[in-house]
UniProtKB/Swiss-Prot annotation:
GO biological process: translation
Family indicated by similarity: Belongs to the eukaryotic ribosomal protein eS4 family.
Organism this protein belongs to: Methanopyrus kandleri (strain AV19 / DSM 6324 / JCM 9639 / NBRC 100938)
Pfam families assigned: Ribosomal_S4e (PF00900), RS4NT (PF08071), S4 (PF01479)
SUPFAM superfamilies: Alpha-L RNA-binding motif (SSF55174)
Descriptive protein name: Small ribosomal subunit protein eS4
Keywords: Ribonucleoprotein, Ribosomal protein, RNA-binding, rRNA-binding
Keyword rRNA-binding: yes
Amino acid sequence: MGRARSGPKRHVKRLAAPYAWPIPRKEGGKFAPRPYPGPHTMDTSVPLLILVRDMLGYADYAREARKIITRGEIYVDGVVRKEPKFPVGIMDVVEIPRTGDRYRVVMNEHHRLDVVPISEEEARVKVCRIKNKTYVRGGNLQITMHDGKNWLVEIEDPTDPKEDVYSVGDSLVLELPEPDSGESWKVVDHIPFEEGVWVYAMTGRHSGEVGRVVEIQTFEGPQEDLITVENPEGDQFQTTKGRLIAIGKDEPLVTVRKEE
């Protein structure tokens, strides 16, 4: 009789790791670190160790990457993260104050998680997709974002919630705190998902593409809205609403593609 498993797996086989992880499959050992359960899904995030070693190239080996992380040199969304298995995902802002480097985590056109360099000013901006909304005790509205953040909207009159102007699929623009400031993020704007807004494809066949919404097709029943997007070159593609995130009204507010 085999020995019972004592707990969750600590690692994942490289060959079985999510396709989005930009790691060698047949080199560097048999296993890769498994991210802790956290704000992102395993398919749309990587452990911080992989980001530091494989995506940023700050270390050649896992041991070196762990030292960098546990020394408190890596900040995610303005908060220091010292756990090598902390999941870092799409739209997260990564900062290394010692080097002055700043990056945004994205899904590129090859369906791989990637990082794009951003400015000091842009490092204070993050766009989050509204994933869910629920009313909680007291009649207030709780909004859950795609990265696991929760935002409480105070409702003055629960029988007439005029403050609830948000829909699942809309985006919230966050102002992120400076590293070590002790402050928290705050919501500074709302981007309704509607025709004319700029969107970025986070997943799916068109991942990494950016354009404006030109048509929204809605259906009765559980079928998801079908969105037609036109890129800056005038080419169009279609995808479902759940694969897109609105990133700006008149222009994109954040950088999601590397300069060619």
